[in-house]
């Protein structure tokens, strides 16, 4: 096959699932993206893909060229950016491609902003067949895919092995801990008992810490207690009273046994990080992007040093035999319902290929989106932590693609605060939270029991 025919075949095969494009000599696509130092190549890879496509057009003897108009916003977070994007769409300024947090996909679909990519994905296995399958869940809405994951992460429990050693636990215990968690043999209650034991023996000053404010991290702990917070068929949030009671009861148990500070929700982020990185706390649950700061804080030089010092585990199961969980929060590309959605989908596919995505992932401490990336030299050399984290995606939960998940998280967090500080019993906190969910979310939430 000639270079010309190959380029043409790639272009038309990748776009065949959408309407055939009508090209002018120069086509301008609008790309919406936050100015985000934590992920500059999310937008940059689209620009690079357009440059590559232009080289293909030139090689094929075509005068067609693609230009990218970057609509770069200064919104402080992905939620604010999503609201601004919806506002732009409402006044007819829908971008052809947007970088967004996956949980907003439902809102984008309902607003008529996001194009359905099912047929595009199915028709393009050379781009997508190696995608880590769990990641597709993050772009689903009512059973269909409306985005392409661009990065992922793992939020899990970090464990300080030296504190375990100082408390009298041998290397065999440390080595077997991840496997015991994975098999459901080490529970959430076992975790708090272990952390409390290290405090009682003087090996740790604090048992473990969690984030000090509202956020998605708590979802993995809730999932460990059987709380499935989304009903995909009805596209609604949901909560189970029995599961929430068990979850809040576990938090009370951890405070009462001395493993979790009662004032945890009054900590600052600096004091939370310092508790673990300073060697005071046995554990912390947060995200894989902490590895760099942990390496520096503990004076570590590579993967061998790191995993001798620290162990990663899922959020353990609530009961023996249950399933452990963790959390991932992908950022995604969506394709707008615009005149050039077919061309936009092709650029998204090109930007999602292993070479550009690896440059983004390794440079920003994100796990890969395809299995093949972990064998690439750049990942092997610089991304050893990301390679180690990739298998954990098999247990990953994702935030629901629902516009009110932020409110849901904020309300359930008030129960965390109330229980940990002792202001309410778990049962009282559950009643308060369920009442607030019904008032604030109305028909958007299902109370299961």
What are these regions (language model features)?
Residues 21-107, 122-125, 167, 171-172, ...:
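Conserved N-terminal structural module of periplasmic/extracytoplasmic solute-binding proteins
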Residues 25, 60-62, 167, 256-259, ...:
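Extracytoplasmic/periplasmic substrate-recognition and gating elements
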Residues 71-84, 103, 182-190, 263-277:
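Short helix-initiation/N-cap motifs at beta->coil->alpha
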Residues 100-156, 165, 189, 307-316, ...:
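Hinge/lid segment of periplasmic solute-binding proteins
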Residues 118-131, 173-184, 227-246, 296-305, ...:
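Short, solvent-exposed loop/beta-turn-alpha elements that line the ligand-binding surface or hinge
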Residues 142-151, 155, 182-237:
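Extracytoplasmic/periplasmic solute-binding protein
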Residues 190-198, 233-268, 315:
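Glycine-centered hinge/linker elements that transmit conformational signals in sensory
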Residues 307-317, 361-418, 443-449:
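Long, aromatic- and glycine/proline-rich binding clefts that accommodate carbohydrate-like moieties
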């Amino acid at each position: 096959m000639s270079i010309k025919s190959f380029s043409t075949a790639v272009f038309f095969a990748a776009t065949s699932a959408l309407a055939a494009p009508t090209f002018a000599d120069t086509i301008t696509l609008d790309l919406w993206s936050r100015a985000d130092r934590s992920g500059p190549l999310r937008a940059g890879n689209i620009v690079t893909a357009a440059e590559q496509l232009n080289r293909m057009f030139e090689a094929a003897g075509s005068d067609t060229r693609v230009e990218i108009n970057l609509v770069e916003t200064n919104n402080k977070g992905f939620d604010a950016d999503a609201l601004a994007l919806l506002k732009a769409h409402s006044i007819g300024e829908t971008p052809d491609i947007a970088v967004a947090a996956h949980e907003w996909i439902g809102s984008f679909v309902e607003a008529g902003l996001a194009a359905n990519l099912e047929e595009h994905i199915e028709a393009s296995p050379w781009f997508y067949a190696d995608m880590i399958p769990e990641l597709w869940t993050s772009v689903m809405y009512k059973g269909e895919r409306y985005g392409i994951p661009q990065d992922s992460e793992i939020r899990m429990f970090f464990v300080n092995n030296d504190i375990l050693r100082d408390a009298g636990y041998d290397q065999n215990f440390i080595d077997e801990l991840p496997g015991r968690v994975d098999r459901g043999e080490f529970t959430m209650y076992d975790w708090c008992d272990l952390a409390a034991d290290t405090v009682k023996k003087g090996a740790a000053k604090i048992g473990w810490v969690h984030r000090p404010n509202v956020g998605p991290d708590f979802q993995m702990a809730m999932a460990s207690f059987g709380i499935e917070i989304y009903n995909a068929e009805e596209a609604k949030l949901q909560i189970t009273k029995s599961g929430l009671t068990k979850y809040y009861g576990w938090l009370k148990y951890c405070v009462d046994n001395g493993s979790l500070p009662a004032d945890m929700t009054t900590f600052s982020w600096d004091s939370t990080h310092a508790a673990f990185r300073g060697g005071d706390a046995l554990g912390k649950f947060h995200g894989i992007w902490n590895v760099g700061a942990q390496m520096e804080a503990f004076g570590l030089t590579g993967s061998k040093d790191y995993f001798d010092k620290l162990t990663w585990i899922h959020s353990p199961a609530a009961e023996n035999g249950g399933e452990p969980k963790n959390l991932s929060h992908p950022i995604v590309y969506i394709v707008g319902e615009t005149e050039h959605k077919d061309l936009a989908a092709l650029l998204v596919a090109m930007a999602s290929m292993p070479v550009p995505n690896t440059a983004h992932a390794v440079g920003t401490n994100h796990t890969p989106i395809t299995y093949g990336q972990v064998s690439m030299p750049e990942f092997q050399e610089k991304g050893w932590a990301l390679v180690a984290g990739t298998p954990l995606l098999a247990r990953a939960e994702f935030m629901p693609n629902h516009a009110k998940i932020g409110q849901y998280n904020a309300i359930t967090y008030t129960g965390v605060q109330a229980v940990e500080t002792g202001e309410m019993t778990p049962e009282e906190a559950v009643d308060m939270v369920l009442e607030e969910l019904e008032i604030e979310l109305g028909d958007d939430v299902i109370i299961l029991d």
